[in-house]
């Protein structure tokens, strides 16, 4: 990807200093919650916990399989969040967690909750550590977003498994190296993972190939099972590693696939803007540079514009123009892949279907408060902002546009 346009940094700010600085409220269809129904609907409020970990503790305490609990979306642990879950059986929170996880039954539904029922999210955020001299720039960017919106890129939360050399675990898998894929899944730490967990994964990384020792350092039943099987193999083949990857929960395999689709879509969109001679700036992200168009360029992208996220049934059967197909092939080639990887899912039990995604998003009810003294940073300012976004749109990407240093 040619980076002819300039790079831009960001204005000074801190986000998520406390969970209360990042408040998220899930929005469901107005007619979904009823007075009667097969499924009970609960409001789940949490702070400092991600959704899946909270559900695991709730399911264990309630003696209910986690697969019996429906939810419409996952929420970050570095936030104070309110969302909804469904179950046909009563649910409760462990007593020791009631200060950080609250669960209230609020009604019933005729169907279990799923991601298709997530209408969007309402956000209330606090930006801290702001410089007085940069307030004018923030206000200017606020006006630009209110008028022009922002580009609907996937943000870093989508890529929790990102490696500096291999990028995503699934990329080596596509290239026939299932062993490296498995190694990354088992040994590459997540951002924010505790030191003890990171140290254990480092030990597994160093011991890789010594399956008996790896088995001793295993923590979960799945890890023990994987290393036990490898110990029995005299010469594991790529098929051996591939079959072992299929033992991971469907949720984890789905994340491997969806993060790949998201990465390709991000780079696809940026490359299209550049090929259309858009003016603007690049920003640096964990997964690589992304292009933010300037005002005149972004206004040429209709709010109704959708660009399919690449996937099954393959790029030639999707509604791409010839130029878009050529651009997508270029992006895949830069990642060492051919277009055939998008014809079907690499895992038989997981779908990798294409779906429509809006390119440009206009936030609803976007408001900015007064700039006040920051109680956590003497001499600095803080400001409260609020807005609503459709499901699947990243609030942190809006913040990146709001805090962009370049005036575009």
From Swiss-Prot:
InterPro entries: PsdUridine_synth_cat_dom_sf, PsdUridine_synth_TruD, PsdUridine_synth_TruD_CS, PsdUridine_synth_TruD_insert, TruD_catalytic. It comes from the Bacteria. It catalyses: uridine(13) in tRNA = pseudouridine(13) in tRNA. Keywords: Isomerase, tRNA processing. The active site is at 76 (nucleophile). PROSITE patterns: TRUD (PS50984), UPF0024 (PS01268). Residues 149-362 form the TRUD domain. Coiled coil: none annotated. Responsible for synthesis of pseudouridine from uracil-13 in transfer RNAs. It holds the Pfam family TruD. Gene3D superfamilies: TruD, catalytic domain. The keyword Nucleotide-binding does not apply. Its EC number is 5.4.99.27. GO terms for molecular function: pseudouridine synthase activity; RNA binding; tRNA pseudouridine(13) synthase activity. It is an enzyme of class 5 (isomerase). Belongs to the pseudouridine synthase TruD family. GO terms for biological process: pseudouridine synthesis; tRNA pseudouridine synthesis. This is tRNA pseudouridine synthase D.
């Amino acid at each position: 990807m040619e980076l002819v346009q300039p790079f831009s940094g960001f204005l000074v700010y801190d986000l998520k200093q406390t969970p209360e600085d990042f408040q998220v409220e899930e929005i469901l269809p107005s007619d979904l919650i009823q007075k009667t129904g097969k499924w009970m609907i609960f409001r789940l409020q949490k702070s400092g916990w991600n959704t899946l970990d909270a559900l695991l503790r709730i399911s264990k305490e309630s003696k209910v399989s986690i697969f019996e609990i429906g939810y419409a979306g996952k929420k970050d642990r570095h936030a104070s969040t309110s969302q909804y879950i469904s179950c046909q059986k009563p649910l409760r929170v462990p007593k020791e967690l009631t200060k950080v996880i609250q669960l209230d039954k609020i009604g019933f539904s005729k169907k279990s909750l799923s991601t298709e029922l997530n209408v969007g999210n309402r956000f209330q955020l606090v930006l801290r550590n702001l410089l007085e001299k940069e307030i004018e720039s923030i206000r200017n960017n606020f006006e630009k977003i209110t008028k022009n919106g922002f580009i609907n890129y996937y943000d870093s939360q989508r890529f929790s498994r990102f490696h500096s050399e291999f990028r995503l675990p699934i990329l080596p898998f596509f290239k026939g190296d299932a062993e490296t894929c498995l190694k990354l899944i088992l040994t590459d730490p997540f951002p924010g993972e505790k030191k003890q967990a990171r140290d254990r994964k480092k030990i597994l990384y160093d011991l890789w190939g010594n399956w008996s020792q790896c088995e001793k350092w295993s923590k979960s039943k799945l890890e023990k099972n994987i290393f036990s099987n490898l110990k029995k193999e005299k010469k594991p083949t790529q098929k051996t590693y591939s079959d072992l990857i299929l033992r991971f929960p469907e949720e984890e395999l789905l994340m491997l696939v969806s993060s790949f689709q998201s990465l390709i879509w991000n780079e696809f969109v940026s490359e299209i803007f550049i090929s259309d001679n858009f003016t603007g700036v690049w920003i640096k992200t964990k997964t690589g540079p992304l292009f933010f168009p300037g005002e005149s360029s972004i206004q040429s992208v209709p709010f109704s514009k959708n660009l399919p996220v690449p996937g099954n049934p393959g790029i030639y059967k999707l509604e791409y123009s010839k130029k878009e197909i050529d651009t997508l092939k270029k992006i895949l080639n830069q990642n060492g892949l051919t277009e055939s990887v998008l014809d079907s899912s690499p895992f038989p039990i997981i779908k990798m279907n294409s779906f429509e995604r809006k390119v440009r998003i206009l936030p609803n009810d976007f408001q900015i408060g007064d700039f006040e003294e920051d109680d956590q940073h003497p001499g600095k300012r803080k400001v409260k902002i609020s807005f609503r976004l459709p499901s699947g749109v990243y609030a942190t990407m809006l913040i990146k546009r709001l805090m962009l240093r370049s005036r575009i």
